[in-house]
Each structure stands twice: as structure tokens, then as C-alpha cells.
Amino acid sequence: MSNPGTRRNGSSIKIRLTVLCAKNLAKKDFFRLPDPFAKIVVDGSGQCHSTDTVKNTLDPKWNQHYDLYVGKTDSITISVWNHKKIHKKQGAGFLGCVRLLSNAISRLKDTGYQRLDLCKLNPSDTDAVRGQIVVSLQTRDRIGGGGSVVDCRGLLENEGTVYEDSGPGRPLSCLMEEPAPYTDGTGAAAGGGNCRFVESPSQDQRLLVQRLRNPEVRGPLQTPQNRPHGHQSPELPEGYEQRTTVQGQVYFLHTQTGVSTWHDPRIPRDLNSVNCDELGPLPPGWEVRSTVSGRIYFVDHNNRTTQFTDPRLHHIMNHQCQLKEPSQPLQLPSEGSVEDEELPAQRYERDLVQKLKVLRHELSLQQPQAGHCRIEVSREEIFEESYRQIMKMRPKDLKKRLMVKFRGEEGLDYGGVAREWLYLLCHEMLNPYYGLFQYSTDNIYTLQINPDSSINPDHLSYFHFVGRIMGLAVFHGHYINGGFTVPFYKQLLGKPIQLSDLESVDPELHKSLVWILENDITPVLDHTFCVEHNAFGRILQHELKPNGRNVPVTEENKKEYVRLYVNWRFMRGIEAQFLALQKGFNELIPQHLLKPFDQKELELIIGGLDKIDLNDWKSNTRLKHCVADSNIVRWFWQAVETFDEERRARLLQFVTGSTRVPLQGFKALQGSTGAAGPRLFTIHLIDANTDNLPKAHTCFNRIDIPPYESYEKLYEKLLTAVEETCGFAVE
């Protein structure tokens, strides 16, 4: 599907204009800031649109898009106005405009975000105008993708500076001078992206950290040994990695601190001042170029990359290394360095909340900008219908915005329906009755994979489905209503299982194995490297090592016996099942994004908090049309205090769609999908008949309560609503 757009009457093309934000608008009042909004007009066509008004700011953010039908000779005028003044007189409140002529439109479409300087409506106007507006023009087939590089200078009537964005996740205020993406002799970008060198007006020499942390931007690791241009470079200092962006720009990452830099750490900074003419010719396949500001960079046509470091300096370093050993190690980049070539990254923190924010940001960069992951199921057949629909989809489709609908119900999913779907689905797919999982022991109700699940011939496909559901929940910020064993989370992280992990799963076996390690077993035990287990009523034997039934356990080899026993206990008959589940999980959550977490943290990310802190709940509740001293509020909390843990969880599920609490607590409850921030639990006093039951709005975490006359009536109605009702509707 590569049609250029949707045409109307054969003479116009459909273009989606996105007005992202404006920067540094003129302040024309001494005591107050303007309320800016943008107006979009397709000149001569009658098409006119206005953005929302943003209050009291010189840097409004709109991020709104409009579909325009533009003819071959049409132009687009985008003007910014102060809503506080537009009613006073004609022309009042004008803050600047930009006009795109027809040739500018054809050249700017599908080139990413552009930052355009605002200008006066007429050159003779005396009012001061300043600032920029950030917009993009996309045809239908390119929405969500990047375009080719174009030279935008001279196309705009106001001749504003054009800034191109490298992708949807990169803010335009965080650009820096960087080596240009690799281009061949024709000037076409090798990476297929739309990022080229842009010189920031502030000359701020920093690159956005997210861009280098984005898994889509990281290129394969290139070592100097596999470069084909004939010269050998010294090894990188310990802790450094050489990486390449998708545009072919080489940078260096210090893995311990997370600091990135364009400067090659193998080259002392004083060598960069050497006269290029004194270094001799460039290696074969290399070319020297300069940025718009005159800074030199080097193009490697062999590897299709660009860099600031002169490749000839490696030859000097090799020669010096042959003459003498370095007297001191290379200096590591400092955490707070503000040198112009260093790319400061966020400090690595053990704080789980901070690491979770980084994970959420990385996942948001992978979410497609258009389309939905639509799932429609019935409550009666939720497991099988969800399985069939999820397994038909591609992983990239599952990353689109999640929209769930229960058949026969009219509820609109802005997050609440999806949370209830996951809650109900987990009760089915994790139920030991279905044979996929089992409890770790008879009296410990954490879940582990059932080694006898192969009784279902399609069990591997179902484990793949379970992995996808777990990944889907994490990707979209929801939680799985079920607890697995700690070793299960360690296996998901690729970490080895240890004897200490057995204590929480099988305390008796752990106690026995610890006794073996701590005591002399020679006169006591007569074991071999062969163990027995029960499978469908039959006693089967398993050799822990080849010919294990003939190898006795002694003081010398008992540590090996315990290690092999522990590994067998956790992986007995579940290797294929676990690999299928892990495959489904990693289709949505790449393995490298999980490296900063340990098993306890991963458990919280997947399952959230299962314990409800009543004080935290109370202190992070919003009241609407009532106050803390209102009878309804006091009676509500009195009722909650009388509930046991199970009923409190059911109440939370009734109002929010989930029994789980975010790891930050109730202050981080998520509301409607795509909301800018959390949405607190809300008690809303409504004017309604007191014979009605309380109503819940799961997308807004809100419960509507009529003005009941007594505590007893509120308790009865609330309990009935929580225990006896289900389903969604639209008011």
C-alpha cells in the first residue's frame, strides 16, 4: 500500500498535519502570559481548524493532528493567537504565523517534524513576533514512518529554520551537533531514516539519552578487527562498547556509568588537535566532510558509518603502544560531565521506580503510532476465544493500543475493560484445573509449570499464548493476577537457579539438601545420582548424570549431587514449556530490557502489589462533590475497614478493573489508556435515587455513590454491587 494519499475529486491529496508545539512565543503583556492556540487554514478551500487553547504559557504543547485536502496550487497558513485578546479587535492577539506554499508542501511532506520560525502577517506590522512552531505533514501511507532527507531551505515564505526529527520519540528541543548519517555519493541516506545534521540554535552539544538507549537505534557492535579498511585499531578500554546508530553514526558507551560520547576513548583528546595534513592520506574507503558549522567528520564507505574521530589517529596510537606501555589507564567519563562531545546518560540506580520509568519509556518507543489491537471475547469462553485471537496476531500488532470488548456489552475500553479482561483471563489460564500450571507444594500456592502438561497435545502453543499475555500486560502497563515461584522469574531473566531458591518453593526438600551439605553422609545415606518422581501414578527414575544409578553419593561429590538435584527439581520435564512461554514473553518485552532487574523486581513488574495498604489507599483518594467529613466518605471507609483482604481486592477490582496495585502504591493507579499521568481512586457523590447501586467507572478509577441515608444501606448496596454485578455499559 504505497499510494500517495487519498484524493478527493481527483485534484487534491489528503495530508495529515500534526501541530506538535510552539516555542519561545512573544510575551506582549507585562503581568500575564498568553493563552495560545493555533489556527490552520488551507487558503481558498474553506478548510479551517483550531487547536485547543493552552493556558498561561509561552511554550504551548498541542500534539493534535488534522486531515487536510490540499490541491496542487493550495497553500497552508498556520497562525498562533492569544485567546485572551482575540475578541478585543480585529487582528488582536496575533502571535505569529507561517505560510507553506504548494512547492513547500510537496517537499516537506513525510520528512518528520519541522521547526519553523514564526513571522509577521505583514512586513509593515509593528508588533513584535518571535518563536517557532513544530509541525509535520504526512500522507496516508507514511503516517507513523519516516521519510527521506530533503533540503528545506528556501521553501518557506518566512524562510524559517527547518529542524528535522529522527523519529517519533525524539524531542526537537534536544538536538545537538552530530556527525551526519552515512550517505552515498548520491546523497541518499543509507539507513533509510530522515535524520541529518541539524545545528541547534543554542549550540547545545548534547544528544538525547533516549535515542541512544532506544533498542531500535542501537546498531550491532562493531569491533575494529572486522573493519575491512586495512588498519588495525587498539582494543577499547575495559567497560567501553562501540555502537552504531541506525543512521550509521559511531558512538561509544561506557557500560558502567551509561555515559555515551562521540569521542573515541582510545584517542587522547590532545591528539585531536593534530593538523590533518601531517597525518598522511586517509585509509582506503574513507572520506572527510564537514558539517554546516564547519566541523570535520569522517565517512567510512566500507562500513557505511560516520564519526568525528580521525581514523588515521589509530595508526599513531598503535605506533605509540608498540614503543611503550601506557603509564596510566584512560580516564573514564564523569557522570555529570558537560563537555560538548559527551552524551550524559541517566545515573544507573537501584531504585525500582526509576528503572521502571526507563522500561516504560523504552516500551513506549516500540508502540506503533497508528492502529489498535482489538480483542472481542465473551465472558463465558474468555480463555479459548482469547487464545484464538491472540495467537492469530503478529507481535507488532499486539504492541498497538489495546482495545478490549466483551461481546454483548457496550463499554468503551480506555483501560478499564482491558484490566478486567486480564483479571478474568488470568483466573482461567493460570488455574491448575487446566493442567498448564500447578501449585509448587500442597500448602504453598505459588505457581510453577506443570511437567505433565504434555497430556494436552497443544500445550506448547498454550504456553506461547501465556507468555504473550504476560508480555502484553507488561507492555501496556497492566498486571497479571497470579503469583509464580521466585525461580520462575530468575529463569525469565536467564539467571542460574541456586539451592537458596528452593526454600520458598519446597521447604522440606531444601532442609534435606542443606543437611546433606552440612553433615557427613558416609554412614547415613545410601543415595546414587538417580532420583525418583511420580508421573500419572507411575514411579519413574531419572539419572542426574550419565550412568547415575551406578554412581554413589559421597562426601567428595555431594555438592555436585545437590547442584544437579536442584536444577532437575526446577527444570524437570518443563524445558520445552518454559522456552515456549519465554518466546511469547520476549516477543513483546525484549530480553535486554530486563537486564537491570532482579527476580523480585520482575515479580513486581509482572504482578504488581497483591497486598492492599488501607492507609495508602485513603491518603491517595480523590473526593468529588464531597469532603472527607461527609457521611458517605466516612461510611465508605468504615465499610472497607470491615472487609477482609479478599473483599477489599474485589472492591478494588470492581472500581479499577484489577485487584493489583502498582508498585508505587495507590498514587500511581493508571486510568484511561494514553493518559499523561496516573488517575487516583475517586469517590464521587452523585445525585441519584438511593435505591440504585453504586456504579464504577474503571477507566477513571471512580465509584459513583448515591446519597444513602444510613451506613447500613451503603454497606448493603456496596456489597451487592461488588459481589453480584458484572458487565459494562455506556451512559
Swiss-Prot record:
Pathway(s) this gene product operates in, as recorded in its UniProt entry: Protein modification; protein ubiquitination
GO molecular function: ubiquitin protein ligase activity; ubiquitin-protein transferase activity
Catalytic-site annotation from UniProt: 699
Region called Disordered, residue ranges: 216-237
CDD domains to which the protein is assigned, alphabetical: C2_Smurf-like (cd08382), HECTc (cd00078), WW (cd00201)
Domain C2: 1-120
One cellular-component annotation, GO: cytosol
Main location: cytoplasm
EC number: 2.3.2.26
Gene Ontology biological-process annotations: autophagy; BMP signaling pathway; cell differentiation; defense response to virus; negative regulation of ossification; negative regulation of transforming growth factor beta receptor signaling pathway; protein K63-linked ubiquitination; protein polyubiquitination
Annotated HECT domain residues: 394-731
Keyword Ubl conjugation (UniProt): yes
Post-translational modification: Auto-ubiquitinated in presence of NDFIP1. Ubiquitinated by the SCF(FBXL15) complex at Lys-355 and Lys-357, leading to its degradation by the proteasome. Lys-357 is the primary ubiquitination site.
Membrane topology: Peripheral membrane protein
InterPro entries referenced in this protein's UniProt entry, alphabetically: C2_dom, C2_domain_sf, E3_ub_ligase_SMURF1, E3_ubiq-protein_ligase, HECT_dom, Hect_E3_ubiquitin_ligase, WW_dom, WW_dom_sf
Residue ranges the record marks as coiled coil: none
Alphabetically ordered keywords of this record: Cell membrane, Cytoplasm, Differentiation, Isopeptide bond, Membrane, Phosphoprotein, Repeat, Transferase, Ubl conjugation, Ubl conjugation pathway
Organism superkingdom: Eukaryota
Any Pfam family matching the protein: C2
Domain remark in the UniProt entry: The C2 domain mediates membrane localization and substrate selection.
Annotated function: E3 ubiquitin-protein ligase that acts as a negative regulator of BMP signaling pathway. Mediates ubiquitination and degradation of SMAD1 and SMAD5, 2 receptor-regulated SMADs specific for the BMP pathway. Promotes ubiquitination and subsequent proteasomal degradation of TRAF family members and RHOA. Promotes ubiquitination and subsequent proteasomal degradation of MAVS. Acts as an antagonist of TGF-beta signaling by ubiquitinating TGFBR1 and targeting it for degradation. Plays a role in dendrite formation by melanocytes.
Subunit structure: Interacts with TRAF4. Interacts (via HECT domain) with FBXL15 (via LRR repeats). Interacts with SMAD7 and TGFBR1; SMAD7 recruits SMURF1 to TGFBR1 and regulates TGF-beta receptor degradation. Interacts with MAVS; the interaction is mediated by NDFIP1.
PANTHER family noted in UniProt: E3 UBIQUITIN-PROTEIN LIGASE SMURF1, HECT DOMAIN UBIQUITIN-PROTEIN LIGASE
Protein name per its UniProtKB record: E3 ubiquitin-protein ligase SMURF1
Upper taxonomic lineage: Eukaryota, Metazoa, Chordata, Craniata, Vertebrata
